[in-house]
């Protein structure tokens, strides 16, 4: 028996970002009987907007286990081993990129199940594209330390790497801590460091701007409290 295929399906980056989902993705979803995601409730809500006429009751929704033991994930891939295609969804953006879906993809390769990435919105790539910072050498750091001493120490390490290799660093913060994070950046980065703020990407209130720390000190920061955002620093 031939095995099914795992399709990696990008999701909207937020409410109002549905326009970024290409028609060919919707066609693939319509032909998929199994969907893996972090939370079935979120995925169902997204699909009701993207495909109002989709018969959700005919789709089997499988949720990623929180602690992700390999045995639990292998159970999710059982339909593919029996010849059925599976769509893997992220909560927002692309599966496997700063996303727990990477463990599903890892096991799919181990089980020799074909993996097909589909094109769609990735906040990391969109922010890097729009920042004007070095796209040849970059590192996504995820969440930086919350406590100020550890955060300042991490920034020093990043600044050293930037000076040596012109590396661009991308990172995120819990939305309600955005402003606190920006304050620390303002206080601890050299004036000539370039900082890009990319918030609400693909959404109606999208904001993207790259300025030096010195310029940000003069203009002040935008109001991105509780908004999903990426921060990029570079030369």
Residue ranges of predicted features:
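Conserved helicase motor
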Residues: 62-69, 144-148
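A contiguous loop/helix-start segment that scaffolds small-molecule binding in enzyme catalytic cores
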Residues: 3-7, 84-85, 163-235
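Class I SAM-dependent methyltransferase SAM-binding "motif I" and its flanking Rossmann-like core
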Residues: 103-161
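Short active-site oxyanion
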Residues: 29-35, 112-116, 168-169
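Alpha-helix capping/helix-boundary segments
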Residues: 41-43, 93-94, 123, 177
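Glycine-rich, flexible N-terminal cofactor/catalytic loop recognition
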Residues: 1-64
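Short glycine-rich anion-binding loops that position phosphate/pyrophosphate groups of nucleotides
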Residues: 13-14, 91-95, 175-176
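Glycine/small-residue-rich loop that forms an oxyanion/phosphate-binding "nest" at active or ligand-binding sites
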Residues: 65, 72-115
């Amino acid at each position: 028996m031939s095995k099914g295929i795992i399709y990696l399906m990008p999701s909207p980056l937020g409410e109002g970002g549905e326009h970024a989902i290409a028609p060919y993705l919707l066609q693939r979803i319509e032909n998929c009987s199994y969907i893996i995601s972090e939370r079935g409730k979120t995925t169902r809500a997204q699909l009701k907007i993207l495909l109002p006429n989709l018969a959700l009751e005919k789709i089997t929704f499988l949720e990623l286990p929180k602690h992700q033991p390999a045995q639990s994930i292998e159970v999710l891939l059982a339909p593919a081993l029996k010849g059925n295609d599976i769509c893997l969804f992220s909560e927002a953006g692309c599966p496997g990129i700063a996303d727990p879906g990477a463990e599903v993809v890892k096991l799919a390769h181990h089980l020799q199940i074909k993996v097909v990435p589909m094109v769609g919105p990735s906040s990391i790539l969109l922010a890097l594209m729009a920042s004007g910072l070095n796209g040849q050498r970059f590192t996504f750091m995820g969440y930086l330390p919350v406590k100020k001493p550890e955060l300042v120490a991490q920034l020093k390490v990043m600044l050293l790497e930037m000076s040596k290799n012109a590396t661009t660093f991308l990172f995120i913060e819990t939305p309600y801590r955005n402003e606190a994070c920006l304050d620390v950046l303002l206080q601890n980065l050299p004036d000539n460091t370039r900082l890009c703020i990319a918030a609400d990407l693909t959404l109606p209130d999208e904001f993207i701007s790259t300025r030096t720390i010195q310029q940000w000190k003069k203009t002040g920061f935008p109001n991105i409290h509780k908004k999903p955002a990426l921060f990029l620093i570079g030369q």
